[in-house]
UniProtKB/Swiss-Prot annotation:
F-type ATPases have 2 components, CF(1) - the catalytic core - and CF(0) - the membrane proton channel. CF(1) has five subunits: alpha(3), beta(3), gamma(1), delta(1), epsilon(1). CF(0) has three main subunits: a(1), b(2) and c(9-12). The alpha and beta chains form an alternating ring which encloses part of the gamma chain. CF(1) is attached to CF(0) by a central stalk formed by the gamma and epsilon chains, while a peripheral stalk is formed by the delta and b chains. Signal peptide: none annotated. It comes from Frankia alni (strain DSM 45986 / CECT 9034 / ACN14a). It is a peripheral membrane protein. The lineage of its organism: Bacteria, Bacillati, Actinomycetota, Actinomycetes, Frankiales. Its main location: membrane. Produces ATP from ADP in the presence of a proton gradient across the membrane. The catalytic sites are hosted primarily by the beta subunits. One of its GO terms (cellular component) is proton-transporting ATP synthase complex. It is an enzyme of class 7 (translocase). It catalyses: ATP + H2O + 4 H(+)(in) = ADP + phosphate + 5 H(+)(out). ATP binds at G168, G169, A170, G171, V172, G173, K174, T175. It holds the Pfam family ATP-synt_VA_C. The keyword Nucleotide-binding applies. This is ATP synthase subunit beta. Belongs to the ATPase alpha/beta chains family.
Length: 479
C-alpha cells in the first residue's frame, strides 16, 4: 500500500516518538512527549483503551503545542476508558483515507475505515490535509455544468468546478435531487460522485445508502460519514476526508467529480465546538474566531484544474432563517449558485420543487451563457413574478376580474410552472414515468417559444412532468 503523506518529522530523519496521556477532558487529550520527539500540528496519534476486556485503538489529531513537551490533541472517537499514563504512539503522518476505484460503492468513516465491509483493498492512501491547487493550475475559463434538468439549466445554471448551495427543508425532494445528480454524472458524463455526511443522523445516512443502492447509482459513489453522535473532531474532519477522495479522482484519474456535503452548517458547528474545547476566545455570535479560515481551507480545494473539476453541491441549514448569521454568511461568499427548494411548489406536486424566483446563479449573465439564454431566462422569471404578484387579487376577486392581458399572462405562467417539472431517472420506480435528460438548446428553445405564446393553445396538464416540448405536444394529443 502506498501512503502519500510525508511528515515533516520523518522528513527530518527523526523517528516518531512515544508519549503518555497527561490529561483527558472529554474529546481533548493532553499528551506528554520528550522535547525532541514533539509531533507536528495535524499529526495523527494512536492510543489503546480497554473497555470490558476489549482493547480499541483511538486516533487523536494534534491541534496545539503547549510548552516544550506537551501537545493538545482532539480525539476522533469517544474517550471513555482512556486513562492517564496510557502509552501514545506518534504515527509520523496526518490522518489519511483510501483513494481510488476501491472506494466506489463503499461507506467510510473519517479515518478511512470501511463501515459496510470488513476491508477495502486500496493501494493508495492520501492525507486529508492538502494544499489547494496552485493559481497557475486552475482552469481560467468559466464553463456551465449542464445537468439536463430544465429549471436548473435555464434559471440557476451550475458552474463546472463551482460550489452550489442547496436550500431545502424536510420532504421537499432534496435527497432525490442528490441521487439524480449522482446518476447523471455517472451515466451522462462518465464521472464519479463523493458524498460527505457531516453531522448526519445515522438513520438518514443509512436510508441514503439503501436508496442509492436500489437506484443503481452506488457503484459510482464513495460515501464518507461523520455521524451526529460522534465527537466534534470527527465532524470537523469528515468533509476533508471526502474532499481528498474527490481530489484523487480529479487529479490522478482525470475525472469530473461531483462532491456532496450535507450539511455544511454542521462543519461550522463542529469547528465552533473544537475551538471552545481548545480554549479560544469566541467571536461573533459565539462562533470560532477562525471561522473564515476554516471555511476557506475547505472551499478553496473545491475547484477546477486544467480540464477536470470538482463541482460541489452543499446542503445549507440557516439557523432561525437568519441569513446574516456568521455560519451561512461565511458560506455564501464561496457559492457560485443557489438552488432553493420551495415547499409551496412541492405541495402542487411539481418536482423538482426548485423555486424559479428564489434560485440564482453567478453565471446567469449574457457574457457566460449567450444573449438568447439570458433573455429567455429573464422573460420566464418576469412572467412568473407577475403571476405571483397577481395571486392575491385572484384569490380575493377571482381571475375574471383581471385584464385580458393579465389573463393571458397568468395562463402562460401556469404552463411555464408545470413545464418546469421533470421526471427523474431515480424516481421511475415511484412515478412509472421514464426519466428525461433535456439538452440545453432544447430547454432554451422550448421556454422561449412558450413565453412568446406559441403553445398557449395546449392544455395546462400537457406540460406536467414531461421532458422536451415534444412530450407536451404528445400529452396534449392524449388528453
Amino acid at each position: 500500500m502506498t501512503v502519500t503523506t510525508s511528515s515533516p518529522a520523518t522528513a527530518e530523519g527523526r523517528t516518531p516518538g512515544i508519549g503518555r496521556v497527561a490529561r483527558v477532558i472529554g474529546p481533548v487529550v493532553d499528551v506528554e512527549f520528550a522535547p525532541d520527539e514533539l509531533p507536528e500540528i495535524y499529526q495523527a496519534l494512536e492510543v489503546d483503551r480497554t473497555i470490558g476486556g476489549e482493547t480499541l485503538t483511538l486516533t487523536l489529531e494534534v491541534a496545539q503545542h503547549i510548552g516544550d513537551n506537551t501537545v493538545r490533541a482532539i480525539s476522533m472517537q469517544q474517550t471513555d476508558g482512556l486513562v492517564r499514563g496510557a502509552v501514545v504512539r506518534d504515527t509520523g503522518a496526518p490522518i489519511s483515507v483510501p483513494v481510488g476505484d476501491a472506494t466506489k460503492g463503499h461507506v467510510f468513516n473519517v479515518l478511512g475505515t470501511p463501515l459496510d465491509v470488513d476491508k477495502v483493498d486500496a493501494e493508495t492512501r492520501w492525507s486529508i490535509h492538502r494544499q489547494a491547487p496552485a493559481f497557475d493550475q486552475l482552469e481560467s475559463k468559466t464553463e456551465m455544468f449542464t445537468t439536463g434538468i430544465k429549471v436548473i439549466d435555464l434559471l440557476a445554471p451550475y458552474v463546472r468546478g463551482g460550489k452550489i448551495g442547496l436550500f431545502g427543508g424536510a420532504g421537499v425532494g432534496k435527497t432525490v435531487i442528490i441521487q439524480e445528480m449522482i446518476r447523471r454524472v455517472a451515466k451522462e458524463f462518465g464521472g464519479v460522485s463523493v458524498f460527505a455526511g457531516v453531522g448526519e443522523r445515522t438513520r438518514e445516512g443509512n436510508d441514503l445508502f439503501l436508496e442509492m443502492t436500489e437506484a443503481g447509482v452506488i457503484e459510482d459513489t464513495a460515501l464518507v460519514f461523520g455521524q451526529m453522535d460522534e465527537p466534534p473532531g470527527t465532524r470537523l474532519r469528515v468533509a476533508l476526508g471526502a474532499l481528498t477522495m474527490a481530489e484523487y479522482f480529479r487529479d490522478v484519474q482525470k475525472q469530473d467529480v461531483l462532491l456532496f456535503i450535507d450539511n455544511i452548517f454542521r462543519f461550522t458547528q463542529a469547528g465552533s465546538e473544537v475551538s471552545t474545547l481548545l480554549g479560544r476566545m469566541p467571536s461573533a455570535v459565539g462562533y470560532q474566531p477562525t471561522l473564515a479560515d476554516e471555511m476557506g481551507v475547505l472551499q478553496e480545494r473545491i475547484t477546477s484544474t486544467r480540464g477536470h473539476s470538482i463541482t460541489s453541491l452543499q446542503a445549507i441549514y440557516v439557523p432561525a432563517d437568519d441569513l446574516t448569521d456568521p455560519a451561512p454568511a461565511t458560506t455564501f461568499t464561496h457559492l457560485d449558485a443557489q438552488t432553493v427548494l420551495d415547499r409551496s411548489i412541492s405541495d402542487l406536486g411539481i418536482y423538482p420543487a426548485v423555486s424559479p424566483l428564489d434560485s440564482n446563479s453567478r453565471i446567469l449573465d449574457a457574457r457566460y451563457l449567450g444573449q438568447e439564454h439570458y433573455d429567455t431566462a429573464r422573460e420566464v422569471q418576469r412572467i412568473l413574478q407577475r403571476y405571483k404578484d397577481l395571486q392575491d387579487i385572484i384569490a380575493i376577486l377571482g381571475i375574471d376580474e383581471l385584464s385580458e392581458e393579465d389573463k393571458i399572462l397568468v395562463n402562460r405562467a401556469r404552463r411555464i410552472q408545470r413545464f418546469l417539472s421533470q421526471p427523474f431517472f431515480v424516481a421511475e420506480q415511484f412515478t412509472n414515468i421514464p426519466g428525461k435528460f433535456v439538452p440545453l438548446d432544447e430547454t432554451i428553445d422550448s421556454f422561449k417559444r412558450l413565453s412568446q405564446g406559441d403553445y398557449d393553445h395546449l392544455p395546462e396538464q400537457a406540460f406536467f412532468m414531461c421532458g422536451g416540448i415534444e412530450d407536451a405536444e404528445k400529452n396534449a394529443e392524449n388528453l
